[in-house]
Amino acid sequence: MWTGLGPAVTLALVLVVAWATELKPTAPPIFTGRPFVVAWDVPTQDCGPRHKMPLDPKDMKAFDVQASPNEGFVNQNITIFYRDRLGMYPHFNSVGRSVHGGVPQNGSLWVHLEMLKGHVEHYIRTQEPAGLAVIDWEDWRPVWVRNWQDKDVYRRLSRQLVASHHPDWPPERIVKEAQYEFEFAARQFMLETLRFVKAFRPRHLWGFYLFPDCYNHDYVQNWETYTGRCPDVEVSRNDQLSWLWAESTALFPSVYLEETLASSTHGRNFVSFRVQEALRVADVHHANHALPVYVFTRPTYSRGLTGLSEMDLISTIGESAALGAAGVILWGDAGFTTSNETCRRLKDYLTRSLVPYVVNVSWAAQYCSWAQCHGHGRCVRRDPNAHTFLHLSASSFRLVPSHAPDEPRLRPEGELSWADRNHLQTHFRCQCYLGWGGEQCQWDRRRAAGGASGAWAGSHLTGLLAVAVLAFTWTS
């Protein structure tokens, strides 16, 4: 049937099949240009002057980005806007007092937007260079039903507001109206905030911390049967936030591990499905590209200063890299640097465990990008649930001391063997950066399009199919 096809048909069909099976392209990496970024966002600058225990500068060079979440640091590559640093975010404080109206429908969006410029300008003072900008609003959630436990105050006060305006309404009508008013106002606050800050600092990648969430914490109640999978209802609720994903330019899920999950398969599953859900959202809610995903994690377990085990470094940083995240952000608060002892423990952990692993996985992701994707994409695990990672092969590489002043303490020595390349090709595929295509990101679509901006193959697919059909008609 197909033997009589001419070269035009053959080429068109090859392009259609190849482009249709590719992953959507994503934004090229920022900062160092590495396919997988590891950022350090812990206020460890106090360890030297205050506690006489500075961290090793050579260790810190293992991180692509260094920042601090503390108030006094501005113009950083990573900026986190907590609720008191960006506009007038309506919420209830820790003692239940209303701040800026309490519930979003009681806040002033206009006044909030008026204040944004000054706040953004204070923390991000220049347009260049590009960076990550994370809005951390955790007091309420824009989906009504997700405001459970201590967040139920937002539903309760929303119902009271409606009841005060309509005392004759039945309870079910009050609830329905309260939900509508809350969700509409929450959406407006989040959307208009994103639109403003994106227009004001367009080179930064903007999104909300902990969005999307997976709500897969049921290991506490169901340890024996825990799978880590996101409940179907929560996946559906994430899809209700399509308006948020459409306006975001990056996603920032969180995979903080409780010590209950330490060195367990449950810990890996908890992380894996949260990252997979973020990558799903990043992919399905944009027609022509996938949003970059930067995963927040901690160098220690939640609510403590015990460093992650080797297994859990793999389950957090390694799993994120293998699944195709753009990077991880290692976050910590002032509790990491309260004394000489806490700084010493952190310094020892960095030298002994964290830095060697970060160097390993960062370079493994880079070598895979070079070998598999021509340096124009990142490697993504073919089977998301497979137990395979982007690690340097012990038979081909070793980490050796680096004496160059501008390099990390350790660097890889060796090269990929044919067995390494076969392993990568078997277990990983490429996700190309915008403007590149092909199974190995070998096609420069910008050049093929005559200088037009690089868009995903999906935008060309209809045209290619038309070419194929037309050419087949000519040869029939």
UniProtKB/Swiss-Prot annotation:
GO biological process: carbohydrate metabolic process; cartilage development; cellular response to fibroblast growth factor stimulus; cellular response to interleukin-1; cellular response to transforming growth factor beta stimulus; cellular response to tumor necrosis factor; cellular response to UV-B; defense response to virus
Compartments, as annotated in UniProt: Cell membrane
Catalytic activity: Random hydrolysis of (1->4)-linkages between N-acetyl-beta-D-glucosamine and D-glucuronate residues in hyaluronate
Enzyme kind, highest EC tier: hydrolase
SUPFAM superfamilies according to UniProt: (Trans)glycosidases
Documented EC number(s): 3.2.1.35
Disulphide bridges: C47-C343, C214-C230, C368-C379, C373-C430, C432-C441
Prodomain residues: 452-476
GO function terms (MF aspect): hyaluronic acid binding; hyaluronoglucuronidase activity; hyalurononglucosaminidase activity; receptor signaling protein tyrosine kinase inhibitor activity; receptor tyrosine kinase binding; transcription coactivator activity; transforming growth factor beta binding; virus receptor activity
Active site: E138
Membrane topology: Lipid-anchor; GPI-anchor
EGF-like domain ranges (all copies): 364-442
Pfam short name (any one): Glyco_hydro_56
Residues in the signal sequence: 1-20
Lipid-acceptor residues (GPI-anchor amidated glycine): G451
Family: Belongs to the glycosyl hydrolase 56 family.
Quaternary structure annotation from Swiss-Prot or TrEMBL: Interacts with MST1R. (Microbial infection) Interacts with Jaagsiekte sheep retrovirus (JSRV) envelope proteins.
Additional information: Acts as a receptor for the Jaagsiekte sheep retrovirus (JSRV), which induces ovine pulmonary adenocarcinoma. A possible mechanism is that binding to JSRV envelope proteins may liberate the oncogenic factor MST1R that is normally negatively regulated by HYAL2, leading to oncogenic transformation.
Name assigned to this protein: Hyaluronidase-2
Taxonomic lineage: Eukaryota, Metazoa, Chordata, Craniata, Vertebrata
